[in-house]
Amino acid sequence: MFEWGRAICYSGYRQEQSPKTATYPTYEQIKEDLTLLNELGFKYLRMYDPIRYAEETCKVIRDCGFDMQLMLGPGLISEVNNPGCPWNKTNYSEEELKQRAERNDRNIDELIRIANENSDVINSVSVGNENTPQWGENNVPIERLISFARRLKEGTGKPVTFNEGVYEWEHLKQLADELDIISIHSYPLW
């Protein structure tokens, strides 16, 4: 499916920049980062949040002629309350959970748009990232993840993956059956 190459998760935020405040790296900052990664031989990048930052990253790759491709995923937020999350005990109302699900739907739509407009750079799309663990802050029901996988496959024609820790995959067979690639996080210590 893909030629072998070095891969890295890319997030080029500088001090005072954050997706939470909608302050993103500039074109020149992204170019600086990708020039370094290109010199180090990285061919594949993984990013989340289908926003201007991802589009700008695609533009830099294209403008500079870097031999790089991007796996882009949505920045999903929780659609269920998770009392098992040790650092976020927020108890969202039904209305808030509905709004969060609508935001995730918009994120998937935006991901499809960006993947199609940058099909020369984006080689695969992800349903999400760590959205099922018992300790997770941004959990999404498996049925919704499956529907996202189907929408992404139909909407982009790109290989579809989901990024999750090694221990969660034993509970994700239904989702795995919908995917083209299984992306496993294997932390050395946790």
Descriptions of predicted regions:
Residues M1-D33:
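Boundary/entry segment of secreted carbohydrate-active catalytic domains
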Residues W4-Y10, L45-M47, M68-P74, N123-V127, ...:
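Hydrophobic faces of well-ordered beta-strands that scaffold small-molecule active sites
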Residues E28-Y53:
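Catalytic domains of carbohydrate-active enzymes, especially glycoside hydrolases
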Residues E39-F42, I122, G157, L179:
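A structural motif
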Residues Y44-E56, I77-N81, A101-N104, P133-Q134, ...:
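Acidic-and-aromatic substrate-binding clefts and catalytic sites of carbohydrate-active enzymes
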Residues T57-K158:
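Substrate-binding cleft of extracellular glycoside hydrolase catalytic domains
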Residues L72-P74, P83, N123, N129, ...:
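Aromatic- and acid-rich polysaccharide-binding/catalytic face
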